[in-house]
């Protein structure tokens, strides 16, 4: 149903471990495992990738070479702002060609007076008030800019079993936040 409705399925790794907690070889193996599962599920072509927890940063740019090697054409893995976990503020909000072969499409931000906040997917979409998300979307549309959004199955599926995200280093607060407001998603 997802494919026939015109939606794209992108790759997000199998184990959801941040890039800086893996070697390039571990990342390649984890990526391949996820790709194989998606192909078995009926995905015909994988073009897009998003790193767990937006962990593609200045220090983990080696991942672009592996993404290119595996045939990806774009990544939406950079959070171009300061964040308690990951972020690459100096990257900027513009789409950029990386390593001459793959596009990086940074996550959509809501520009506040003194800082910017991610607003268009997953945790941010679930926890921010709807007025803020709507205002952010309108801001981008008024400037003819796209809004990039994403959702995990657990963002919508309130029946999915609770689990500790490996990339959050067993931090109970961050893991608690990951499950907040799941019941509000479909209404939004």
Task: Please place each PLM-identified region on the residue numbering.
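Catalytic alpha-helical scaffold of carbohydrate-active enzymes acting on polysaccharides/glycoconjugates
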Residues: 1-48, 53-113, 129-188
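Surface-exposed cleft-lining segments at the edges of enzyme active sites
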Residues: 117-127
